[in-house]
């Protein structure tokens, strides 16, 4: 690979996946500032925030405090993030069959990992494990969401779901499930079994991490 290529030319020749985080960010930023070319600015920004994830997760005040980037770049990045979220949701909606959890995990992380309050979300699936709809059923405080199994089952029956996937975030950033997380998962599973609905998984979303009950054989 020709290391002398500028990021945009490198992308056109080899594809976006061949670029480093700094090169991708340089394309996004487009220009540098006085005495700091765009590639150096990109590296400075990544060093300041720790990673692309750290940059994307930054709030407006944190983002704009970094020399060389400001409100325009913040708005553009928020728009890009939202477009990515909608793209992933569209991928799920368009007859997506849940034979692999990779797209699901990516979507759930985009949807939940940067929220300040705990959100309990449910994906409702048909008998071929295709998405019928998703619902944010419960919104909690900074560290707790009140989840009622009967409401989950009520929604599942209303849309004739054959299976469900549960997900919630931990605003603390730690993806390890709590004792109450395990309790509510078991309660929903037992309630679902009474009406022949399968609980396929329960994802706990943290900062850059997740926990899958199914992957850990807890369902």
Language-model regions, residue ranges each:
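C-terminal extensions
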Residues: 16-17, 21-31, 35-40, 87-135
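Long, highly charged, low-complexity intrinsically disordered interaction regions
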Residues: 1-63
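Divalent-metal-activated hydrolytic enzyme cores
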Residues: 139, 186-219
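Conserved hydrophobic/aromatic pocket- or pore-lining residues that grip, position, or stack substrates
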Residues: 129, 166, 201
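Short acidic/polar active-site loop segments enriched in Thr and Asp
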Residues: 17, 162, 198
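Alpha-helix N-cap and loop-to-helix initiation/capping positions
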Residues: 176-184
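Short HxH-centered metal-ligating active-site micro-motif
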Residues: 139-177
């Amino acid at each position: 690979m020709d290391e002398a290529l500028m990021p945009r030319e490198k992308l056109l020749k080899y594809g976006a996946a061949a670029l480093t985080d700094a090169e991708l960010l340089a394309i996004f930023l487009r220009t540098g500032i006085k005495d700091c070319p765009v590639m150096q600015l990109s590296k400075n920004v990544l060093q300041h925030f720790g990673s692309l994830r750290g940059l994307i997760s930054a709030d407006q005040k944190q983002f704009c405090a970094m020399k060389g980037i400001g409100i325009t770049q913040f708005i553009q990045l928020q728009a890009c993030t939202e477009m990515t979220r909608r793209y992933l949701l569209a991928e799920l909606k368009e007859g997506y069959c849940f034979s692999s959890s990779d797209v699901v995990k990516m979507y759930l992380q985009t949807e939940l990992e940067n929220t300040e309050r705990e959100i309990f979300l449910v994906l409702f699936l048909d008998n071929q494990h295709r998405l019928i709809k998703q619902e944010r059923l419960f919104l909690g405080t900074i560290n707790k969401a009140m989840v009622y199994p009967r409401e989950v089952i009520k929604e599942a029956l209303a849309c004739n779901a054959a299976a469900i996937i549960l997900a919630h975030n931990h605003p603390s950033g730690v993806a390890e499930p709590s004792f109450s997380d395990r309790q509510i998962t078991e309660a929903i599973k037992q309630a679902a079994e009474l009406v022949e609905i399968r609980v396929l998984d329960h994802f706990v979303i943290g900062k850059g991490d997740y926990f899958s009950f199914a992957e850990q054989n807890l369902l």
